[in-house]
Design a protein with these regions (language model features):
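Cleavable N-terminal export/targeting peptides
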Residues: 1-20
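Transmembrane beta-barrel domains of Gram-negative outer membranes and organellar outer membranes
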Residues: 14-244
Length: 247
């Protein structure tokens, strides 16, 4: 299996794409079942100098993040991420690890609304984060009706390290429509909003919209998206691909 997300044709100032570009829905492994997703991206044209001492500039760095998860109960799933990167002219490096616990409330999986929560804790290298210990609390909301699927994640990101700064707010949205059996087309929007207590103007911070294809192929779940940055702080063009399976 392989996953690849390429930031392509980018021009101007860019930031490193996240290790996981995904809107959480009600996907959940059955109790005792494992799953594996692979996420990857590369900024083709971006910053070439660090924004803080020790940061690895993102240009031409390939990021690959395997995500292994396991169903604990019908409503709980435990996941583990390993963050890796391949800088130009260097060997693969480990950027840290994260663990998550996802809860999805019982619901009709075929139609109607659903909700859940996701808590993530991690330690990352100085190359990708100025503070090593970080946490994210994610709300999961969604709805299925006819051929349509809607999803929304409101995220609170906080540093657990000393002097980590204010809690940051972001919003991820998804709307997809089934166009054939096992095939959906849609849009995903990823918006960083700034500090929770005083969000920034909408014209600030990275915001990117993706045209996406969701496809089941031979037991694999594929999410392919082409993204367009909407602000000067976002990558201009991003191509993302996530490949997942259960076993």
């Amino acid at each position: 299996m392989a996953g690849l997300a390429l930031a392509c044709l980018a021009q101007g100032d860019c930031r490193a794409a996240a290790e996981e570009i995904q809107v959480y829905l009600d996907d959940l492994s059955a109790p005792g079942q494992f799953g594996l997703d692979l996420h990857s991206n590369v900024v083709r044209s971006g910053a070439t100098s660090p924004s803080y001492a020790g940061e690895r500039p993102p240009q031409h760095v390939v990021r690959l993040t395997p995500e292994l998860y396991f169903g604990l109960t019908p409503a709980l799933e435990l996941g583990l991420y390993l963050l890796t990167a391949h800088p130009p002219g260097a060997a693969w490096q480990v950027d840290g690890a994260k663990v998550r616990l996802k809860y999805i409330a019982p619901h009709d999986g075929a139609t109607g609304g659903f909700w859940g929560l996701n808590l993530e804790l991690g330690r990352t290298a100085l190359t990708v984060s100025e503070k090593p210990w970080n946490a994210q609390f994610k709300t999961i909301l969604g709805y299925r009706g006819g051929p349509w699927k809607l999803g929304a994640n409101l995220n609170l990101d906080a540093s657990l390290s000393s002097g980590g700064g204010p809690v940051a707010l972001s919003l991820d949205l998804k709307a997809a429509r089934a166009v054939a059996e096992h095939t959906e087309l849609g849009l995903e929007l990823y918006s960083e909003l700034g500090p929770l207590r005083r969000p920034d103007a909408l014209s600030r911070n990275p915001k990117t919209i993706y045209a996406v294809l969701d496809q089941e192929i031979g037991g694999l779940d594929v999410n392919l998206g082409l993204g367009r940055g909407l602000t000067t702080e976002a990558d201009r063009w991003v191509l993302k691909l996530i490949v997942g399976t259960h076993f």
